Regions:
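A C-terminal junction/extension of Radical SAM enzymes
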Residues: 180-198
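Short, charge-patterned binding micro-sites
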Residues: 41
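Canonical Radical SAM [4Fe-4S] cluster-binding loop centered on the CxxxCxxC motif
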Residues: 1-18
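Conserved AdoMet/S-adenosylmethionine-binding subsite of the radical SAM
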Residues: 25-35, 44-176
Length: 198
C-alpha cells in the first residue's frame, strides 16, 4: 500500500505491506474506529484496490472512496461488490476548464461523465465536491458546474488550503463571502450545496 496523496517532499513516506495494513486495521478496531476512507491521489490506480477494500469490509468497517472519476469501471466494480458505502467524487471545474485545472493540455471527459452517470443512477450514497482555487475558479465556472450537475445530489465546495506539500506553488483561496456567492450560484440548479473549510 502506498499513499499517492502526499507530495514527494512529504515526510514519512513509505510503502506498507498488506500484513502491516492488517495490523493497522486491527489496531483501529481496538481504538473504536468504525470506518476508513480509501483516498489518494487517485486510489483506483492501485491494482490491489478491490482486495484492500474487501479486507476492510470483511473486518466490519464502513468504507468511503475518494475518487477523481477517471476509472469508472473500477469504481463500478467496487460498488457492484458492495465494497464501498460512500463515494466522494471530485468535480475539478466546468468541463471547458477541466484540462487547465488538472494541468493538462487535453483531457478526456468521457470517464468523468461515465462516473457521474454511474453514481447518479446507482445504489451507493455519494457526493460531488470541488476544491475551490482562486486562480482556477470563477462565478462563471460555477454557473456551468451548477447547470452540469443539475439535480438533488449533494455538492460541496471545499476551500483550497495552501501548504508546503502542494505541488503547484502560488495558488490561493477565495474569501468566505466569495465561496458563499459561488454556493448560491450553484443552488439555482443543485439545492443541496454546502461549504467546507471556512
Amino acid at each position: 500500500i502506498h499513499c499517492f496523496n502526499a507530495a514527494d517532499n512529504a515526510p514519512l513516506m513509505s510503502e506498507w505491506s498488506m500484513e502491516e495494513a492488517d495490523r493497522l486495521l486491527d489496531q483501529a478496531r481496538d481504538c473504536g474506529i468504525n470506518a476508513f476512507t480509501i483516498t489518494g491521489g487517485e486510489p483506483l490506480v492501485n491494482k490491489n484496490g478491490d482486495d484492500f477494500a474487501r479486507r476492510i469490509k470483511d473486518m466490519g468497517y464502513l468504507v468511503k472512496l475518494d475518487t477523481n472519476g477517471t476509472f469508472p469501471d473500477k469504481m463500478q466494480s467496487l460498488i457492484d461488490a458492495w465494497l464501498v458505502d460512500y463515494v466522494a467524487m471530485d468535480i475539478k471545474n466546468s468541463p471547458e476548464k477541466y484540462a487547465e485545472t488538472v494541468g493538462l493540455e487535453k483531457f478526456d471527459m468521457e470517464p468523468i461523465y461515465e462516473s457521474m452517470r454511474l453514481l447518479m443512477g446507482g445504489k451507493t450514497d455519494f457526493e460531488f465536491r470541488t476544491t475551490v482555487v482562486r486562480e482556477l475558479h470563477s462565478a462563471e465556472d460555477f454557473e456551468k458546474i451548477g447547470a452540469w450537475l443539475k439535480g438533488d445530489e449533494k455538492y460541496f465546495l471545499q476551500n483550497f488550503t495552501d501548504s508546503e506539500f502542494v505541488l503547484q506553488k502560488g495558488l490561493g483561496s477565495h474569501s468566505r463571502e466569495t465561496l458563499r456567492s459561488f454556493a448560491d450560484i450553484v443552488r439555482k440548479n443543485v439545492p443541496n450545496v454546502e461549504i467546507r473549510g471556512i
